[in-house]
Amino acid sequence: MILMKDDFRVALVTGHIPVSQIASTITKELIEEKLAIFNQSLKQDFAIDAPRIAVLSLNPHAGDEGLLGKEEEEIIIPALKEMSARGILCYGPYPADGFMGSGNFTHFDGVLAMYHDQGLAPFKALAMDGGVNYTARLPVIRTSPAHGTAYDIAGKGLASEDSFRQAIYVAIDVFRNRLRDKAAHANPLRKQY
């Protein structure tokens, strides 16, 4: 899942799970998998040649060198080093509060949050109107308004069509970008040496 509005894109390591299970769910391998998916989607679906991805920490103050948790040192940083060695431009881990609050997210093509509310709370605070939920790595293109079904306002004349309209536009853009990507990688020239 990638939540996006314009150039602000947030993806998640974990999905809809209880907060009590977040730390035990996050592994080096899971972070590497999500970074690879996010990176590929930014390239193929959003036509970003060399995406820069910021990765948020799990613990406050990025664990404060192990004082507030060891996940950064034992899991997140090793995953970032591995993926960086594979050519993915990933940086962090950044403390979520200061990173989002200072606007540092604007210097990156995407932000990988460790869990649902860590990524979605600031996204919805900063970009709710017109936000789009995009599902990466599917053979079909799937978008929806970032606000979800919004049953609480259904039939009350309160809903804005902006997120729905943006979801359609994103789907069209992704379709075109995928066509270009497919054409660019079709029939590559053979090496002549």
Q: Which ranges hold each PLM region?
A:
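Anion-binding alpha/beta catalytic cores of soluble intermediary-metabolism enzymes, centered on
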Residues: 1-71, 77-193
